[in-house]
Each structure stands twice: as structure tokens, then as C-alpha cells.
Amino acid sequence: MKEIILCKYGEIALKGLNKSTFESMMVKTIKRRLRSAGEFKVTRSQSTLYVEPLGEDVDVDEYMERLSKVFGIVKLCRCGALEKDIRVICEKAPEYAAEALENARTFKVNAKRSDKAFPYKSPEICSELGGAILDKFPHLKVDVHDPDVTVTVEVREDHAFVHTDPIDGAGGIPVGSSGRAMLLLSGGIDSPVAGYMMARRGAVVEAIHFEAPPYTSDRARMKVESLAKLMTPWCGDIKFFCVPFTEIQLLLKKNCPEELFTILMRRLMMEIAQRVCDKEGDIQALITGESLGQVASQTMYAMVCTDAACRMPVFRPCVGMDKSEIVDIARKIGTFETSILPYEDCCTVFTPKHPKTRPSVEEVEKAQNSFDFEPYIQKAVEDTTVTLIKNR
């Protein structure tokens, strides 16, 4: 029996005249994510994408795992594709669902008939197939309210598809449908989650990291590169920019008020990130993992001072989330265990003892203008390295 994966989408179906554009983006993403999994074919019809693995010894579970990380898909169904004949459905559907049914006590049948030319209506399909299942598995009982197994038959244009265990997709909209943004990627828990959340809303995510050797180690940089790699199954390939930041941090420590160190550092990071974006081209925004009030540098006053140095919009998708909520997402996307590895990053090595939580833009700008950072900013941008981190 031929197996096909049905990829169902949610809000894309509501995009009106732009729907086909979103579908095309999702097809491109699927082809990139599955390129190393083997041969396959992708078609689309009736607000569903059909992924058909080709060849022998195909690992359909591997296809399902990769597709579960494609934004835009809300449900994935591993299906047996049957001839649209009620006798074939009643014969083959119980066989396809046998593994699930053998270990169950109760079941129900759910039928969806989008092909209205099919001679049996949905209740009739349920009745016929339910009877066939009871004949083959007499230990089962019907429970339409809380069954152990639901056998679903979808009668569509070309085939009848049978499945038992749909899984949730990643949701959101396809990567690439909402522009391109630069993520300030530290070694912590929050910034990978912020990148994931923006990718889920269609942004192509690139990443920029600031390192401060010898105060930060090669292992710290490798940790951040590993985080970027862990993001690629969700976000796709990521350009990873690494900025040498030691000299600027030492100058800040020497020439600026200690209580404003972190805010001034973040302002200079934003300025460098924007210039790297200008140099790269076609990047519309910055992303940070800041959460309102989580630490002293993430008060509303501090964010206002940071944003005053920005020409580009700054997205903070974690801004209204508790730490526990951010951790839950980090665990889900597979970045948490790497994020908590105990390597210093440049944001922590020079942390002031008593950071100011209610700075004003005027005093921060005055402190920054007390020293000419411009030549050092230019040098940091020139010395920035870039690596393409690929998904698989």
C-alpha cells in the first residue's frame, strides 16, 4: 500500500489571493528540509500538501519528524492511500490500522468526504468501515466519545486516505513570507527562543554573536554556533556573524559610568548589528531575547534607552513571557540543554554590581558621547566573520 503524508495548514487557507504564494514558499521549505532524507514528491490540493516518499526502505518516520518542524503546517497525517471504492476501503483500512487497533480496547471511525461525487455519505462510510473493523477485531468496542483509537478516512479527489494518529505540526506561517531579521544570539536560553518565534511568523533569521576573547573562550563560541545549528531544523540555514567585541568592552569599562555599562554595551551592540545588516543588505529588523523586567538591563527604561540608538525596528517576542514559559519552548525546540552549559558570554563577564534600572536617554547618550567609539565600531564591523550554518 502506498504511503503518503498529508500536511494540513491553518491560517494559510485564509490568505485569499495570496494563498498560492504562501503554499509555494512552504513547498520550497519542505523540499529543502527533506533534501537529504531521500526521494519524494510534493503535490498540493484542497488546502493540503501531499508528500509521497519514493523508493524502497523509506523511513517515513524520518520524513514525519522533519516535516513537524516546517512552519505553516498544523497537522501531519501518515496515511495509506486507497482506491476510492467502499469495498477496498473496508478491506484495506483495517489492515493499515491493525497495529493501533490490536492494542486498543475501543475505537471509532471518522469519515471526511470532500469528494461529494463519492456515492457513500460520511455516516455510511463510518458504518461500513466500523462493521469491517469489528469483524476483524472482535475484541474491540465502539466508543464515539473517548476512543483509544480513531480511524479516519478522508475521501479526496484521487484517493481515499486512512490514518489513525495525526500529529501536531509547527503552526505559524512559512519562513520567508515576512522578511529577514538579525537575531542577537547570546549563549543563553532566551535568544534562541526569540529566533524560533520570529521564524514561526515567517521571518528568515540570521544570527549575530559578540565574543570577547580572552574573557570568553572558544568553547563559548562553539556553544553559540551549536545553538544556531539546533535552530536550523526550524529556521532553515542561518548566516552566523561573529563580532570581536573585547576592545569596545574594555573601553566602556574604562571610560563610562559602571552603573550604565550594560545599557551602553547593548546600544553599541545594536549599532554594530545594524551596520552589519546594512553591509549584508536586505535585512529589515533586529531580534533580541529580552523579557520585560527579567533582569536590570531589561526594564522598560533600559529598553527605551537601547531603542534610542536604533534605526531599525527591534522585535522582542519574549517580552511578555515568564522565564518558565521561555524554558518550556527552549526544551521543545531542543536548545535548552545547550543553553545552560556553563560558559561565559560577553554579556556576563563585565556585569556591573549595581546596574541602573531607570536610566534616562539623556544621561546614557551623554555617557556614550564622552568617548569617541566610532573608530572601534568601524573596526568591529570590518573584522566581523560570517559562517553559513546549514540544516543537515
Can you name each region flagged by the protein language model?
Residues 334-342:
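A short alpha-helix-loop-beta-strand transition element characteristic
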Residues 1-182, 192-239, 247, 279, ...:
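RNA-binding accessory domains that recognize and position tRNA/RNA substrates
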Residues 128-133, 166, 170-178, 245, ...:
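Active-site adenylate/phosphate-handling loop in enzymes that bind or generate adenylated species
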Residues 292-294, 342-350:
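Small/polar glycine-rich anion-binding or flexible loop at a beta-alpha turn
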Residues 183, 207-209, 242, 288, ...:
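Structural beta-sheet core signal
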Residues 188:
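Conserved G/P- and acidic residue-centered "switch" motifs that form tight phosphate/ATP-binding loops
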Residues 342-344, 364-367:
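Mobile late-domain/C-terminal helix-loop "cap" segments
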